[in-house]
Amino acid sequence: MTAMQPGTRVGRVERTTRESSVLVELDLDGTGQVDIDTTVPFYDHMLTALGTHAAFDLKVKSSGDVHIDAHHTVEDTAIVFGQALRQALGGKLGIRRFGDAWIPMDETLAHAAVDVSGRSYCVMTGEPEQYNSFTIGGNYPFVLNRHVFESIAFHSQINLHVRVIHGRDPHHIAEAQYKAIARALRAAVEPDPRFSGVVPSTKGAL
């Protein structure tokens, strides 16, 4: 991935704690170029899918105390991703604001809906409870999906709803969720020529 050039819808956030070190750069008007290394291979796979299908240029570099478990690194990366997304959105002028997507993956079907509203909220439904203790790819507990999506929604100040309609394979469920969010975000942040230079809200602010 080439170095990002300054743009009007670019976010860059670094965050370091005693548990992790995270850098996220993203360009909302990219072409899906991704450069991901979180030291958690399945999470790399999911963030690659997210950046690709959102058509964001996305760079993520994370390291942390994965010798304990992946929780801190995964959640902290989601926090910084949300902050970078919020930064890239700026004043939210001229965006479509709302987006949703249905994503099938073999036996799985997932749906995501996004409102770039400035109001942080996340609702997740339909995930099979028996998978909450299931680990994918060696060190990615399935239950971390909830932490990731809630952290993204809270720190980007978006309203995010994610539904699993049906599915049996935890990998397929997680991947369909990430791709549905990606496509919903892509639609929501897309410029709307009819709202050019205008905040898409009756309040005049988001």
Swiss-Prot record:
Keyword presence, Ribonucleoprotein: no
Localization in the cell: Cytoplasm
GO biological process, one term: L-histidine biosynthetic process
GO molecular function: imidazoleglycerol-phosphate dehydratase activity
PROSITE patterns assigned to the protein according to its UniProt record, in alphabetical order: IGP_DEHYDRATASE_1, IGP_DEHYDRATASE_2
A Pfam family annotated for this UniProt entry: IGPD
GO terms for cellular component: cytoplasm
Source superkingdom: Bacteria
Keywords: Amino-acid biosynthesis, Cytoplasm, Histidine biosynthesis, Lyase
Known pathway: Amino-acid biosynthesis; L-histidine biosynthesis; L-histidine from 5-phospho-alpha-D-ribose 1-diphosphate: step 6/9
Catalytic activity: D-erythro-1-(imidazol-4-yl)glycerol 3-phosphate = 3-(imidazol-4-yl)-2-oxopropyl phosphate + H2O
PANTHER family xrefs: IMIDAZOLEGLYCEROL-PHOSPHATE DEHYDRATASE (PTHR23133:SF2), IMIDAZOLEGLYCEROL-PHOSPHATE DEHYDRATASE HIS7 (PTHR23133)
HAMAP family: HisB
Protein name: Imidazoleglycerol-phosphate dehydratase
Organism: Saccharopolyspora erythraea (strain ATCC 11635 / DSM 40517 / JCM 4748 / NBRC 13426 / NCIMB 8594 / NRRL 2338)
Gene (name only): hisB
